[in-house]
């Protein structure tokens, strides 16, 4: 899980979701997991 100031989709499989006011990227590739923090 990468914690970044700005999250963006890395590949076409990345999905942008919001959980408890946090913007997160989930993907089948675990290297692409990000959240805004």
From Swiss-Prot:
GO terms for molecular function: structural constituent of ribosome. It holds the Pfam family Ribosomal_L36. Keywords: Chloroplast, Plastid, Ribonucleoprotein, Ribosomal protein. InterPro entries: Ribosomal_bL36 (IPR000473), Ribosomal_bL36_sp (IPR035977). Coiled coil: none annotated. Disulfide bonds: none annotated. Its main location: plastid. One of its GO terms (cellular component) is ribosome. It is found in: Plastid, Chloroplast. The keyword Ribosomal protein applies. GO terms for biological process: translation. PANTHER family: 50S RIBOSOMAL PROTEIN L36, CHLOROPLASTIC (PTHR42888), LARGE RIBOSOMAL SUBUNIT PROTEIN BL36C (PTHR42888:SF1). Belongs to the bacterial ribosomal protein bL36 family. This is Large ribosomal subunit protein bL36c. It comes from Chara vulgaris.
């Amino acid at each position: 899980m990468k914690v970044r100031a700005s999250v963006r989709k890395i590949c076409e499989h990345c999905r942008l979701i919001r959980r408890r006011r946090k913007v997160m990227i989930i993907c089948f590739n675990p290297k692409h997991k990000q959240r805004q923090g």
